[in-house]
């Protein structure tokens, strides 16, 4: 049904429903992806719902499209719910438009998906992936035979251990067995004084000797971890602890191929295919500097070519499809290090870092000290760069401000660079922030702002018609201080006054939708305004620290190695060190330190410079901000402890929990 001719005759109920969905698909593509459709016929079509991102493979879609004519090209961008088809002639594309619009196909999971087609004038897709493996990374194909693979898999006994010769655990996203030494996930290390009895299995001996002879490895391993992954399981991005193991990390893939994601601090991501029966060897930069992990999913985006070759996945969107994962078992071999690590990457090396991470605060005094060092001081340092990334107002906040009556007095508590102070010219808005440098930026923009603590705002009680607090309360380090911040906001409101509050959510994936924080494009150097409290950070490696002494006291904190159990369960951090979060990944603790990679000169008036090249030994300064990320219902629960207030609305907005309060 062509929407341009809908006025020529009366549409049926079914046709109207289809037309609404087709128009919605057009608007969604334009709004979220910038893809503009045209009203006239062309050779090219965009196929909404027909993409790798929603489980439709090239092998499924191409035969459907070819029923309408010769397809010159089928472009399927990775992780996108649409594809582009270019036919040989316009007549063939018109036939596909009429025939396939509204057609149901079954994806690889057996679910029905309806296709919506629209014409496009130009098909362009910017390739961003590099075409080289991380330095020091090697993949050796067919390292063992299929018979040897079967023998190794059959040697693994997943029944509970009774002889304590190896340690077995069932983690949320995989099963593991340790040999030689047990890997302790609570501290991401091994106890070098307590080797497991039995050593490595005898069956591995001949393989290790062969790899040594052929020069694939230089050290004979004395520790092995067997991981078993069901389809849909994975392991978070991490770096194996420097001080725990020698340079080589060696992994043998059995049972099924897999795509492993490698990420450099500069934000470059390299997906690497590990074929069945292949050997992955990580040394040097790839072992010490790049994170590696396996995304939890049931299908991998791979090359459509017949042979699944090892190495980087092609960036050619005309040669991508989906590969269904099978049961994969990996044998990972390491050599336990007996001396401190002296690698060439001291900024990310736990042996060469000098300071220890802060502990979780156990008193109000400790919480105040933590906030001073890991919130207030950090924002003073990063104010210029932070402001350069905070320019696009969030739609729901704009909606709240524009709905207020003309002449309302509004306070923005924690106003940052003041991006909301000028949204509605009919309001009288004042802002306050703990950072002098951010307040100075507000004043440069001719906004009314002053420096103060959000727990003690020097404004008369009951004098505000409304307040907003955006991405502020999650910086307070105890529940009592977070409630006190809410009470201070309510104190400012007149009876009937409203407050809008945003905090960062622990649930960065909600209702089966990932937040923009998780989906963010690490490689794009253009527009980057995200909708959460740390979205300007593009670099996934979080353990980089500055060796610059007291000037960056917030940056000398080691990270938690995310090779521990997956999932989003909050860890008990009382009486323990605060973990450092991996940027653009799910949260594993509610109380975390989040890295900020300072780009260019931190001075406000100077331009921001790009990151240095891969392998640079002078990475950008890294600061760490304290956050308490809120679980679902936690913000509402805190609000209910405040007297004389009721919750008008609560909602989730792109990785944030939000409430609108009204003072009684």
Swiss-Prot record:
Catalytic activity: 5-(carboxymethyl)uridine(34) in tRNA + S-adenosyl-L-methionine = 5-(2-methoxy-2-oxoethyl)uridine(34) in tRNA + S-adenosyl-L-homocysteine
Induction: Up-regulated after DNA damage. Induction is mediated via ATM.
Tissue: Widely expressed, with highest expression in spleen, followed by pancreas and lung.
Region (Methyltransferase domain), start-end ranges: 411-664
Annotated cofactor note: Binds 1 Fe(2+) ion per subunit.
EC number: 2.1.1.229
Gene Ontology MF, one: 2-oxoglutarate-dependent dioxygenase activity
Cellular localization per UniProt: Cytoplasm; Nucleus
InterPro entries hit by this protein: AlkB-like, AlkB_hom8_N, AlkB_tRNA_MeTrf/Diox, ALKBH8_RRM, Methyltransf_11, Nucleotide-bd_a/b_plait_sf, Oxoglu/Fe-dep_dioxygenase_dom, RBD_domain_sf
Superkingdom as given in the UniProt entry: Eukaryota
Residues bound to 2-oxoglutarate: 227-229, 328, 334
Keyword Translocase: no
Any GO BP: tRNA methylation
Domain RRM: 43-120
Gene Ontology CC terms, in alphabetical order: cytoplasm; cytosol; nucleoplasm; nucleus
Biased composition (Polar residues): 552-575
Residues that bind Zn(2+): 242, 341, 343, 349
Listed SUPFAM superfamilies: Clavaminate synthase-like, RNA-binding domain, RBD, S-adenosyl-L-methionine-dependent methyltransferases
Function text: Catalyzes the methylation of 5-carboxymethyl uridine to 5-methylcarboxymethyl uridine at the wobble position of the anticodon loop in tRNA via its methyltransferase domain. Catalyzes the last step in the formation of 5-methylcarboxymethyl uridine at the wobble position of the anticodon loop in target tRNA. Has a preference for tRNA(Arg) and tRNA(Glu), and does not bind tRNA(Lys).
Subunit-structure text: Interacts with TRMT112.
Name of this chain's protein: tRNA (carboxymethyluridine(34)-5-O)-methyltransferase ALKBH8
Gene that specifies this protein: ALKBH8
